[in-house]
A protein has these predicted regions:
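Acidic, metal/ion-coordinating pockets
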Residues: 19-279
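Bacterial Sec-dependent N-terminal signal peptides
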Residues: 1-23
Length: 279
């Protein structure tokens, strides 16, 4: 795919020690905000003009999967809200296109609540991808059966635990739109899930986060600094363009990488994880 229509940010990252040398490719989007078509070619910012678009991403993914069928694809939330398509069809277009992209897991952004719980349930039932969120309590809603705290994937002989974190709803979402859903501390929830995934012998633990980078409230930095055992954070919410991975020290002193790709999917993050053989 030509770089003048869709950019892929690329990082090679040595993440964890494993029984033998292995590599794992991850593609990551966040905050696509219903950007169905490419951005206007007339934008003054040439780094954004004529970028992105679902059709281009679908074509790019087809090419990437042809080269590497074992790659993983994740989204960090807020695929909703931002165009007349969302206003008119309430997420059907976005979820339908994401189904064609075959995401391995997606977490929840605050804008997924914009048309209320009933609409979220309707959309999540249509999704052919897992939706993960570990720090919302969905008891008393249909979402309890549709959203998992984590999933475990297997790729290239690796066991990969993936969990989601989402932001505090109060102040971001109208109370009527999230009803009885309870927000729980992301740091405590993250450590609880990591411990479960470690007990299940996961080789790699990935957090898909919609908490945000360098913002008020609990951020990706705070989650990493307050936990141990996370290997990688794929972020969203703050619309931050990270040209390279940012690193935060966890409780064990390990430097943990964080990726985020702005908004509207004009960038798709690509990470190649080099799993080094244990000595």
């Amino acid at each position: 795919m030509k770089r003048n229509i869709l950019l892929i940010t690329f990082c090679l990252l040595a993440v964890v020690a494993f029984g033998q040398n292995k590599k794992l490719t991850i593609l990551h989007t966040n905050d696509t905000h219903s950007q169905i078509y490419p951005l206007s070619p007339n934008l003054a910012d040439t780094m954004k003009a004529d970028r992105g678009g679902f059709v281009r991403r679908i074509a790019m993914l087809k090419e990437e999967r042809a080269k590497n069928p074992d790659l993983l694809l994740f989204d960090s939330g807020d695929f909703s809200q931002g165009s007349p398509y969302y206003t008119m069809f309430k997420g059907d277009v976005e979820v339908g296109l994401m189904n064609q992209m075959h995401y391995d897991a997606v977490t929840i952004g605050n804008h997924e609540f914009d048309f209320g719980l009933e609409n979220m349930v309707r959309l999540f039932k249509k999704a052919n991808f897992p939706i993960v969120c570990a720090n919302y309590d969905f008891k008393g809603t249909e979402l309890e059966k549709l959203v998992k705290p984590y999933i475990i994937l297997k790729r290239n002989g690796l066991k990969i635990g993936v969990f989601g974190l989402a932001p505090k709803l109060d102040g971001l979402v109208v109370k009527a739109n999230y009803g009885p859903i309870v927000y729980n501390d992301p740091v405590a929830c993250a450590q609880k899930i990591v411990n479960e995934l470690k007990a299940k012998k996961c080789d790699l633990i990935i957090c898909i986060s919609h908490l945000g980078w360098n913002i008020e409230g609990v951020s990706d930095e705070e989650v990493i600094a307050g936990t141990r055992g996370i290997d990688l954070v794929l972020g969203g919410h703050s619309h931050t363009y990270l040209n390279k991975l940012e690193y935060v020290k966890d409780l064990d002193g390990k430097m943990i990488g964080v990726d985020q790709n702005g908004k509207h999917a004009i960038y798709v993050g690509k990470l190649v994880l080099d799993m080094k053989k244990k000595k």
